[in-house]
């Protein structure tokens, strides 16, 4: 499995989730020949913030999986916080 396939699957999982609050985007930097990946958070107010980013060409596949696990943890913590606020 290639890095781009892993990122595309992660993106599909995010878009299929209950909340469309988080998304990722890819940006290929032709000057440096690097694939940049950004994790975005879309707030209720309409603002879109960059939560984190990675330069996937500088990461091994294992390191990329670690980064995606880290992002999943960020999203899960935020969802738990939002659920507590609703109660």
Description of each model-found segment:
Residues 1-32, 43-87:
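Negatively charged, low-complexity tracts enriched in Asp/Glu with abundant Ser/Thr
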Residues 35-41:
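Short linear proline/tyrosine/threonine-rich motifs used for host-factor recruitment
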């Amino acid at each position: 499995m290639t890095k781009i396939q892993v990122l595309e699957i992660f993106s599909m999982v995010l878009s299929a989730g209950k909340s469309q609050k988080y998304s990722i985007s890819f940006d290929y930097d032709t000057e440096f020949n690097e694939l940049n990946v950004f994790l975005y958070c879309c707030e209720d107010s309409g603002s879109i913030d960059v939560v984190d980013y990675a330069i996937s060409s500088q990461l091994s596949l294992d390191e990329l999986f670690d980064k995606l696990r880290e992002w999943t943890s960020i999203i899960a913590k935020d969802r738990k916080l939002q659920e507590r606020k609703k109660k």
